[in-house]
Amino acid sequence: TLELSSAASDVYKRQEFLRNQISQRKTIYPPGKEIFNCFNLTSYEDTKVVILGQDPYHGAGQAHGLSFSVKDNISIPPSLKNIFKELNSDLKIKIPCSGNLTSWALEGVLLLNSSLTVESNNPNSHQNIGWNFFTDKVIEVLGNKKDMVYILWGKNAQLKKL
């Protein structure tokens, strides 16, 4: 939509910041080609649920553009273990061996973080670089859809206006 393209043009401004960080030899997660994975895997039309987190995991190999998700063969982080425990306790869903939530994304769950990037080993480091404008616009546009479900995990996520 036109509103999202306006927000997308703002993303260009983030690129300059990220290039600068990389030129200073800082490691940024997720890798560049994976920053927008949540949108590549879950289209606007297919989105039924938004799970909103704070920022990507900041450890090596963890973040891949889906909030709370890690790739196969990566240790499941404590936050995701807690989510799995709650799903098991409340809904009797078996706790998986992998923390890869790609299957959720393909089923219409938009796994979005308030900030789409983070510096290695520095949680919440990109909170103030402007990602909020973009993610606020995404949430605003999705708000036009009927019967959307929002799950807000983390303090920053809970501050979002729905």
Residue spans for each PLM region:
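Single conserved hydrophobic/aromatic residue that forms the stacking wall/gate
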Residues: 1-8, 12
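A polyanion-binding, active-site-adjacent surface
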Residues: 13-152, 156-159
